[in-house]
From Swiss-Prot:
It comes from Mycobacterium tuberculosis (strain ATCC 25618 / H37Rv). Optimum temperature is 45 degrees Celsius. Is active between 20 and 50 degrees Celsius. The active site is at 11 (tele-phosphohistidine intermediate), 84 (proton donor/acceptor). The keyword Disulfide bond does not apply. This is Glucosyl-3-phosphoglycerate phosphatase. It catalyses: (2R)-2-O-(alpha-D-glucopyranosyl)-3-phospho-glycerate + H2O = (2R)-2-O-(alpha-D-glucopyranosyl)-glycerate + phosphate; 2-O-(alpha-D-mannosyl)-3-phosphoglycerate + H2O = (2R)-2-O-(alpha-D-mannosyl)-glycerate + phosphate; (2R)-2-O-[alpha-D-mannopyranosyl-(1->2)-alpha-D-glucopyranosyl]-3-phospho-glycerate + H2O = (2R)-2-O-[alpha-D-mannopyranosyl-(1->2)-alpha-D-glucopyranosyl]-glycerate + phosphate. GO terms for molecular function: mannosyl-3-phosphoglycerate phosphatase activity; phosphatase activity. PROSITE patterns: PG_MUTASE. GO terms for cellular component: cytoplasm. InterPro entries: His_Pase_superF_clade-1, His_PPase_superfam, PG/BPGM_mutase_AS, PGM_Phosphatase. Optimum pH is 7 (at 37 degrees Celsius). Is active between pH 4.0 and 10.0.
């Protein structure tokens, strides 16, 4: 058996994170601390010698990815399927505003991966659009998990909601258990290993969770 290492890095801090405001697919920028966090994460993950870096096109993720690209000399690929969950009517609102307008709705959203805000996506929707990207990378990157340099990871730079949804889908968790994967801090990362035998197809890969919410900087920003 061989293993493909998949690292998923959340973007650095934004002012929306600080203000407990829902971003979704709004194109927000990194804060000054967020840029510092991105550099720190790049320093740690750069030592892993990533095979490639693929990022969401939203600026907070892309700018985080660029720091890792600068550290490793890799050009960052962009894929819109790595965008954060679209939060519909909630985008731009604070947690307090949502709780006042719809008491209990945020709890329902966190506890049910099939639930979506009006006009938005559920975690199941997010996994359905992002999982095919991983399948495409498996098919197109023969060096990933190969015998020569088996531990070089593919790094996806994205968003907390997407990372949780994609991880749950790859791990084939029952949908009712998806909320067990909690929040991630800014510029923190997760690693999954996809165990496979030569000649096997994507559906035969057995993904295992190696690391959840690792960080180059200890912080209390898990939202």
């Amino acid at each position: 058996m061989r293993a493909r290492r998949l690292v998923m890095l959340r973007h650095g801090q934004t002012d929306y994170n600080v203000g407990s405001r829902m971003q979704g697919q709004l194109d927000t920028e990194l804060s000054e601390l967020g840029r510092t966090q991105a550099v720190a994460a790049a320093e740690v993950l750069g030592k892993r010698q990533p095979l490639l870096i693929v990022s969401s096109d939203l600026r907070r993720a892309y700018d985080t990815a660029v720091k890792l690209g600068e550290r490793t000399g890799l050009v960052v690929r962009v894929d819109t399927r790595l965008r954060e969950t679209h939060l519909g009517d909630w985008q731009g609102l604070t947690h307090a505003q949502i709780d006042a307008d719809a008491p209990g709705a945020r709890l329902a959203w966190r506890e049910d991966a099939t639930w979506a805000p009006h006009g938005g996506e559920s975690r199941v929707d997010v996994a359905a659009r992002s999982r095919p990207l991983v399948a495409e990378l498996v098919a197109s990157e023969p060096e990933w998990g190969g015998a020569d340099e088996p531990d070089r990871p593919v790094v996806l730079v994205a968003h907390g909601g997407l990372i949780a949804a994609l991880s749950a889908a790859l791990l084939k968790l029952p949908v009712a258990n998806w909320p067990a994967l909690g929040g991630m801090g800014n510029a923190s990362w997760t690693q999954l290993s996809g165990h496979w035998a030569p000649g096997s197809d994507f559906e035969s890969i057995r993904w295992r969770l190696d690391v959840w919410n690792a960080s180059a900087q200890v912080s209390s920003d898990v939202l």
